[in-house]
């Protein structure tokens, strides 16, 4: 992963690098905080909060070092109801802490917990990006009405449900993510070429040439940084 960060920096790729625990954010901020193109997000991944819930204090103490928050959220693939409760409690606390600032941008995980997460986000004053969204079309419409953005990756265009979801999102609300190393083809070797397939898919489905598409997507990124 250190090689990936160096690759992004050397290639001038503006990137928000997501972390999954406050410990890791702290580590990478100290090691790579001087990078120009790569900025680190303070994360507390829902699948880890039950085991590491004591790190919420470290989350609070590190939030002043970044405006980027993620990955956070809830993941109800677990059948443990106590774990689900803890996920929602931690998410609510994170939203509350972020509301004390006026510049936070949140990358939010919602897998199988879209309804519950969107309810908590009703109280959120920060800008929201829904990461690898896989919920219902009705909830997409609700999120769009609230001004949320959606980050999509190349693995989404390899499933019918993923493609269906992407076609329902306004082009002006789309951001590109890799979700490496958890997506196909990026487990070991990272390259920004993963974006090529996304550009081709969006170009065909939206009838927009790739050059214009690039302008729109870059503008989306600039816009959310300005609004956050």
What are these model-derived regions, one by one?
Residues 1-228:
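Mid-domain alpha/beta scaffold segments of enzyme catalytic cores
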């Amino acid at each position: 992963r250190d090689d990936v960060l160096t690759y992004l920096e050397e290639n001038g790729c503006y990137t928000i690098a997501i972390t999954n625990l406050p410990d890791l954010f702290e580590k990478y901020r100290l090691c790579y905080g001087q990078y120009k193109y790569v900025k680190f997000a303070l994360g507390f991944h829902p699948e880890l909060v039950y085991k590491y819930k004591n790190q919420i204090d470290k989350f609070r103490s590190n939030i002043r070092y970044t405006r980027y928050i993620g990955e956070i959220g809830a993941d109800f693939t677990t059948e443990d109801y106590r774990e689900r409760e803890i996920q929602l409690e931690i998410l609510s606390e994170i939203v509350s802490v972020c509301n004390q600032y006026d510049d936070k941008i949140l990358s939010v995980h919602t897998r199988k917990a879209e309804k519950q997460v969107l309810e908590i986000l009703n109280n959120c004053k920060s800008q929201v990006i829904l990461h690898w969204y896989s919920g219902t079309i009705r909830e997409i419409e609700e999120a769009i009405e609230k001004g949320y953005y959606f980050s999509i990756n190349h693995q989404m265009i390899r499933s019918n449900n993923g493609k269906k979801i992407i076609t329902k999102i306004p082009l002006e609300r789309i951001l590109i993510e890799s979700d490496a190393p958890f997506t196909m083809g990026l487990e070991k070797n990272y390259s920004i070429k993963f974006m090529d397939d996304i550009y081709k898919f969006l170009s065909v489905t939206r009838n927009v040439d790739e050059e214009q598409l690039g302008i729109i997507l870059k503008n989306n990124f600039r816009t959310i940084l300005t609004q956050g």
